[in-house]
Curated annotation (Swiss-Prot):
This is tRNA(Ile)-lysidine synthase. Keywords: ATP-binding, Cytoplasm, Ligase, Nucleotide-binding, tRNA processing. It comes from the Bacteria. Its EC number is 6.3.4.19. CDD domains: TilS_N (cd01992). Its main location: cytoplasm. Ligates lysine onto the cytidine present at position 34 of the AUA codon-specific tRNA(Ile) that contains the anticodon CAU, in an ATP-dependent manner. Cytidine is converted to lysidine, thus changing the amino acid specificity of the tRNA from methionine to isoleucine. InterPro entries: Lysidine-tRNA-synth_C, Rossmann-like_a/b/a_fold, TilS/TtcA_N, tRNA_Ile_lys_synt, tRNA_Ile_lys_synt_N. GO terms for biological process: tRNA modification. It catalyses: cytidine(34) in tRNA(Ile2) + L-lysine + ATP = lysidine(34) in tRNA(Ile2) + AMP + diphosphate + H(+). The N-terminal region contains the highly conserved SGGXDS motif, predicted to be a P-loop motif involved in ATP binding. The gene is tilS. Disulfide bonds: none annotated. One of its GO terms (cellular component) is cytoplasm.
């Protein structure tokens, strides 16, 4: 098992020497095995391993006992342990979601907060190959899109680094063999036997039937997941390119239009992905009652060449076909008169529509990087002049420590910014339209750029009176 996991880590570049790793630990066999495995790599790889356990307080004394068990084992194993308690029941009542979803959201909020607080490179979770099989078959019964089989990703960008799952290459039985051979203690969660939870039903009833004649199904599932994820990444890029070439926005970014011929002449695989991209642009959050039926109606509508007809989607989104010209818009939504795009010289002072101001000046000194309303920009890292604008469809940015990019929409959601505030939120870009500063939330430049020599620009945000 050890060599299989090490080969898997190397293949997917899951770890680097000298990294700081937070391990999500529940006290069960999977997470305890992962913590033990990474602890044994600590000296060889010069990594720092931190255990993070979260008490969901769903099982009374058992939940408390799980937390104490993890803390005590970490103490005796010389592993730093961080413990949190969350109130899942209160979250359920406040947001009216299921127990499973409430627990997951709270868990990942803490994961993200601790990743940033500790400056960790990785969050390691103990999902294994059988979890992958469960996920694939659960999605098959609920999702009618090709990415249903992407399954659980081996790694993805998360908080200050990456979320990794080194155990996706092994199954539950191999993990149980590992903890037995290495005398790693663990606790049994009795709720795992309760089939009222969807995943437990698949785990206890469906998966045993599938693996009865093929114990290595988890390997096939993982290969399928990886292959389809590679294919989907390529198709997603092509769909983005298609949208850029075909779609036309009005000046207020409140209406989309395109020629049906320009759209339907593309491969069907790209058409479907472009359709979903368009909906993601128009909706801040996709409605729960949006289904494959709407997709079928959309494609039936856009193929018409004559006459005027329309269909209504959830939340009053209208899709209209007028003699081959397709338009998507919200009839009852007022145009965004607050859209702006303003040049920013240096030095300068620009007043925004809400009365706030952004000032710019040349400096040689550095700035406290924790100031939310200021940013230091090394001039050799940007294309001048700078611009201040509101959001555009598909806006993404990156920052120090983030692998890849992140949608501005997701940043606002993470920060719990109300939808009505996002349309007027000031964004600073350079002349190449690279986002430098999502004012008050994210900066593209980290502390390493602050320390660079050379001339810099200091931007400051001052709130208005209206």
């Amino acid at each position: 098992m050890k060599q299989s996991i090490l080969s898997f880590i190397q293949k997917h570049q899951l770890l680097k020497e000298g990294a700081k790793i937070i391990v999500g630990v529940s006290g069960g066999s999977d997470s305890m095995a992962l913590l033990h495995f990474l602890k044994n790599l600590q000296e060889q790889w010069e990594i720092e391993v931190i255990a993070l356990t979260i008490n969901h307080q769903l099982r009374g004394e058992d939940s408390t006992a799980d937390q104490k068990f993890v803390e005590q084992w970490c103490f005796h194993s010389d592993i730093r342990c961080i413990a949190h308690q969350v109130d899942v029941g209160e979250y359920q009542r406040q947001y009216r979601v299921s127990e499973e979803l409430a627990a997951r959201r709270l868990r990942y909020e803490i994961y993200e907060a601790e990743m940033r607080k500790q400056g960790a490179d990785y969050l390691a979770l103990g999902h294994h190959g059988d979890d992958q099989v469960e996920t694939l078959f659960m999605r098959l019964t609920r999702v009618a899109t090709s990415n249903a089989f992407e399954g659980i990703p081996v790694k993805r960008s998360f908080a200050s680094g990456q979320l990794i799952r080194p155990f996706l290459c092994v199954n539950k039985q191999l993990i149980l063999n590992y903890v037995k051979e290495n005398e790693v203690p663990f606790r049994e969660d009795q709720t795992n036997k309760d089939n009222k939870y969807t995943r437990n039903y698949y785990r206890n009833e469906i998966i045993p039937l599938l693996t009865k004649n093929n114990e290595r199904l988890f390997i096939t599932a993982q290969r399928l997941s990886e292959t389809l994820r590679e294919d989907e990444n390529y198709l997603a890029k092509e769909a983005n390119r298609m949208v850029e070439e075909v779609i036309i926005w009005d000046e207020n970014f409140s209406k989309i239009s395109f020629s049906n011929q320009a759209f339907i002449e593309r491969p069907h695989a790209l058409q479907r992905r472009a359709y979903h991209l368009i909906l993601n642009y128009l909706y801040d959050t996709l409605p729960k009652d949006l289904s494959y039926i709407h997709e079928e109606k959309f494609f039936a509508l856009i193929e018409r060449q004559e006459g005027n007809t329309y269909i209504d989607f959830p939340l009053s989104l209208r899709v209209e076909n007028s003699y081959g010209k397709i338009q998507l818009y919200f009839p009852n939504r007022h145009p965004r008169h607050s859209v702006f795009h303003l040049p920013l010289q240096v030095p300068d002072q620009v007043e925004l529509p809400d009365g706030a101001r952004i000032t710019s000046e040349w400096i040689d000194a550095t700035l406290d990087k924790n100031s939310r309303n200021n940013i230091i920009i090394p001039i050799d890292s940007v294309a001048l002049p700078l611009h201040i604008r509101t959001r555009k469809p598909g806006d993404r940015m990156t920052w120090d420590g983030l692998k890849g990019t992140k949608k501005l929409k997701d940043i606002w959601i993470d920060a719990k910014i109300p939808t009505n505030e996002r349309d007027t939120w000031p964004i600073v870009t350079d002349d190449n339209n690279t986002i430098i500063w999502l004012v008050g939330l994210k900066k593209a430049f980290g502390s390493n750029q602050f320390c660079q020599s050379g001339e810099k620009i200091k931007l400051s945000y001052h709130k208005g009176n209206i």
